[in-house]
Amino acid sequence: MLITGFPAGLLACNCYVLAERPGTDAVIVDPGQGAMGTLRRILDKNRLTPAAVLLTHGHIDHIWSAQKVSDTFGCPTYVHPADRFMLTDPIYGLGPRIAQLVAGAFFREPKQVVELDRDGDKIDLGGISVNIDHTPGHTRGSVVFRVLQATNNDKDIVFTGDTLFERAIGRTDLAGGSGRDLLRSIVDKLLVLDDSTVVLPGHGNSTTIGAERRFNPFLEGLSR
């Protein structure tokens, strides 16, 4: 399976491209600010056709280019209904500093939006089966996307957005955030995964569930 990613924009949100192999359909996860140029190069180099845009949550650094990517390639954008409103109001609750960053920018919904309203659902996109788990805490509509046996050595992967990072967890002091919900989501939806599961977060380096279980200071004493 082809998996690649890059940090997009001033807030360095990780945008990911996932495809069964070159020359097939692709899934785009969290296309952030200015992602289109790098995305086009990856798509052209590997002869990929976007089949879907997946959003882990609605904050601006993760959805900035979603409408442009979705409408340019004629593919749907998938988002949890609790965060859908942020497609047109992506700075909701983020404060004046972020508002200054996007001064003058205009956001609208993609022409095709699909709501991820069933926790634990599985969808087939471009020949790839994606499992969706609702993980409220960072936002009410945060989700993680799991793909089984995705790596070259058949390890599972999980796109965690801003729920879980290398040695950190998502912030919960923004509108819609809840520390209690975040920890419950991590325990119930992430710490139940195999230690070998590769974590592809919304910011920073990749890691594994096992490494975070052992070394993440915010998860000390948590288990299921």
Curated annotation (Swiss-Prot):
Keyword Transferase in record: no
Name the UniProt record assigns to this protein: Uncharacterized protein Mb2612c
Molecular function, one GO term: hydrolase activity
EC annotation from Swiss-Prot or TrEMBL: 3.-.-.-
Entry keyword set: Hydrolase, Metal-binding, Zinc
InterPro entries cross-referenced by the UniProt entry: MBL_Glyoxalase_II, Metallo-B-lactamas, RibonucZ/Hydroxyglut_hydro
Family statement drawn from the similarity comment of this UniProt entry: Belongs to the metallo-beta-lactamase superfamily. Glyoxalase II family.
Cofactor binding summary note: Binds 2 Zn(2+) ions per subunit.
Sites where the protein binds Zn(2+) 2: 61-62, 162, 203
Amino acids binding Zn(2+) 1: 57, 59, 138, 162
Cofactor(s) annotated in UniProt: Zn(2+)
Domain of life (superkingdom): Bacteria
